[in-house]
């Protein structure tokens, strides 16, 4: 008899294969064992660190090839952990001062760090706790001489089942053999979920108990479309899901026909579908999926996973590569958005009680112009290689925009005096992420060339709900009428001044939100490249006039639930 296990759909698709249980290695040891050869034990620890660096470097290089530089940056962060004296020194001191064995010293110190980071109300710090756990496990395995599971050695078709997949586990998956995976823990924003989407393999996370309910070699089905795992399916279920898998692949193939098609509603209104990227490595997916431009180029990945700032020349080459590849299509580059959930080890940013509302993004750049000016110079120099738009993140006041623009114009003049060619067709815009900015959209619209609505932050700031907090996640409501009204206000303000508005948050590629955004008059929808063709098909089947009527009714609703019901009744 088959068994159904529910989880969170993390990556689309249907996988059918035997279960491969990722068995946790035995990393037990005697915590109370004292050592007499202290120097030898420190050397043993140092040797484990060096061996871990060698392994992680190989994994990092493989991840860059398979997943792109932005995903590989996770392992750059792991390598930095192994070089962090604030972590390494206390471990060595514990061995020397307490005669602790290397395994005990490592786990005691890293557990303290993990506990501190996990208690912080900060997404970046919580992710760093996971990084430290992953790195600590690898170092411990070398201390104990125990081999960690290596998914890259799998040589038959399987679905991986485990408690969780670490970033290094996921980076070693071979798409040829690993058909999908299912885990006990995790969410849609966990490292493993993000990487599964990059690898385009079906994945389900957060099942709570799958490792207790599946045995090695069980036949299982992973339905990444609905979040279902079927263990030991019946013959009828097997046939049904094989059919569902074939239909899924047929649908993907059918969508490819829309790659070069226009995005136009049934009543003739055009929309622009653009892609979000982190590095030039993301360009193949952008082109394969028929993006009409890049609506968000996150430049912070150029700064992450390294121990010093990128030079102006390094930045220039990265921006030039993207602009040339897009061949005249619009590329919207967001200036450095560091702080909040993204930090740089070499900047030594002050700790803050609430970093999401603190020293970050444009605030940091205006205060530290030695960071800001080289980026602006690199962008201006690259502008002659394509259609460049520049936008500033986290702008709260018109004076911030004016100051940023003044610095850019100053650097433009400097570059011209140095003999550089600069495009005269660069549009300057801002991210609308703060409710105050949306409220003054009419004021901003007189001075900016465009808006890009960053819904991820706009939603959590408007509803005062941390989207990473399970206790208040019910308040993170993309379809709340308050959000729709702010979006409408921003779009109308831009159109009144003859300007345009895009959206680059997750909402832009959401199938429930798309009809509403189309009706509200959104000009550009920027999303993950893999969502573009589905969004194009959806928009090409909608009527702009009908969606305008829908949106007008939606902003008058009282709750998110009413909005969802309204959309479901309109769009069937």
Swiss-Prot record:
Phosphoenolpyruvate binds at residues 298, 334, 456-457, 467. GO terms for molecular function: kinase activity; metal ion binding; phosphoenolpyruvate-protein phosphotransferase activity. Mg(2+) binds at residues 433, 457. Its EC number is 2.7.3.9. PROSITE patterns: PEP_ENZYMES_2, PEP_ENZYMES_PHOS_SITE. GO terms for cellular component: cytoplasm. Keywords: Cytoplasm, Kinase, Magnesium, Metal-binding, Phosphotransferase system, Sugar transport, Transferase, Transport. GO terms for biological process: phosphoenolpyruvate-dependent sugar phosphotransferase system. It holds the Pfam family PEP-utilizers. The active site is at residues 191, 504. It catalyses: L-histidyl-[protein] + phosphoenolpyruvate = N(pros)-phospho-L-histidyl-[protein] + pyruvate. Its cofactor is Mg(2+). The reaction takes place in three steps, mediated by a phosphocarrier histidine residue located on the surface of the central domain. The two first partial reactions are catalyzed at an active site located on the N-terminal domain, and the third partial reaction is catalyzed at an active site located on the C-terminal domain. For catalytic turnover, the central domain swivels from the concave surface of the N-terminal domain to that of the C-terminal domain. Homodimer. General (non sugar-specific) component of the phosphoenolpyruvate-dependent sugar phosphotransferase system (sugar PTS). This major carbohydrate active-transport system catalyzes the phosphorylation of incoming sugar substrates concomitantly with their translocation across the cell membrane. Enzyme I transfers the phosphoryl group from phosphoenolpyruvate (PEP) to the phosphoryl carrier protein (HPr). This is Phosphoenolpyruvate-protein phosphotransferase. The lineage of its organism: Bacteria, Bacillati, Bacillota, Bacilli, Bacillales.
């Amino acid at each position: 008899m088959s068994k159904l296990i529910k989880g969170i759909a993390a990556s689309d698709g249907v996988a059918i294969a035997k279960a491969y249980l990722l068995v946790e290695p035995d990393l037990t040891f005697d915590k109370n064992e004292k050592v007499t050869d202290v120097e030898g034990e420190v050397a043993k620890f140092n040797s484990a660190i060096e061996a871990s660096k060698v392994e992680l470097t190989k994994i990092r290089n493989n991840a860059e090839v398979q997943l792109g530089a932005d995903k590989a940056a996770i392992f750059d962060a792991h390598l930095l952990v192994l070089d962090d004296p604030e972590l390494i020194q206390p471990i060595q001191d514990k061995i020397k001062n307490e005669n602790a064995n290397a395994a005990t010293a490592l786990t005691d110190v890293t557990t303290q760090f993990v506990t501190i980071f996990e208690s912080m109300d900060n997404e970046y710090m919580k992710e760093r706790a996971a990084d430290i756990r992953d790195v600590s496990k690898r170092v411990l395995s070398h201390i104990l001489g125990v081999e960690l599971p290596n998914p890259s050695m799998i040589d038959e078709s399987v679905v991986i089942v485990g408690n969780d997949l670490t970033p290094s586990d996921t980076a070693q998956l071979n798409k040829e053999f690993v058909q999908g995976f299912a885990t006990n823990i995790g969410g849609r924003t966990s490292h493993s979920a993000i990487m599964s989407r990059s690898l385009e393999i079906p994945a389900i996370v957060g099942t709570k108990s799958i490792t207790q309910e599946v045995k090695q070699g069980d036949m299982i089905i992973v339905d990444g479309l609905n979040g279902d795992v079927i263990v030991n399916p019946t013959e009828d279920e097997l046939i049904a899901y094989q059919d569902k898998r074939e239909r899924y692949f047929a649908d993907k193939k059918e969508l490819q026909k829309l790659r070069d098609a226009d995005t136009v509603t049934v009543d003739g209104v055009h929309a622009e579908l653009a892609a979000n990227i982190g590095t030039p490595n993301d360009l193949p997916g952008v082109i394969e999926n028929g993006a009409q431009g890049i609506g968000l180029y996150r430049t912070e990945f150029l700064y992450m996973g390294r121990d010093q700032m990128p030079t102006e020349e390094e930045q220039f080459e990265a921006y030039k590569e993207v602009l040339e590849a897009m061949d005249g299509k619009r590329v919207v580059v967001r200036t450095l958005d560091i702080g909040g959930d993204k930090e740089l080890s070499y900047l030594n940013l002050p700790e803050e009680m609430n970093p999401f509302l603190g020293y970050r993004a444009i605030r940091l750049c205006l205060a530290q112009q030695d960071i800001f000016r080289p980026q602006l110079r690199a962008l201006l120099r690259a502008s002659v290689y394509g259609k460049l738009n520049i936008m500033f993140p986290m702008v709260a006041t018109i004076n911030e925009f004016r100051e940023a623009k003044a610095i850019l114009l100053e650097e433009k003049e400097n570059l011209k005096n140095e003999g550089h060619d600069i495009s005269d067709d660069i549009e300057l815009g801002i991210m609308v992420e703060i409710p105050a900015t949306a409220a003054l959209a009419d004021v901003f619209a007189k001075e900016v060339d465009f808006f890009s609505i960053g819904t991820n932050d706009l939603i959590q700031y408007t509803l005062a709900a941390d989207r990473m907090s399970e206790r208040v996640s019910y308040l993170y409501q993309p379809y709340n009428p308050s959000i729709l009204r702010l979006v409408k206000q921003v779009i109308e303000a831009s159109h009144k001044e003859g300007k345009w508005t895009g959206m680059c948050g997750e909402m832009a590629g959401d199938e429930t939100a798309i009809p509403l955004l189309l009706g509200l008059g959104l000009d550009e929808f920027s999303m993950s490249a893999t969502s573009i063709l589905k969004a194009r098909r959806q928009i090409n089947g909608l009527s702009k006039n009908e969606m305008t009527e829908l949106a007008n009714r939606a902003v008058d609703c009282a709750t998110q639930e009413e909005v969802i019901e309204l959309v479901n009744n309109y769009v069937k």
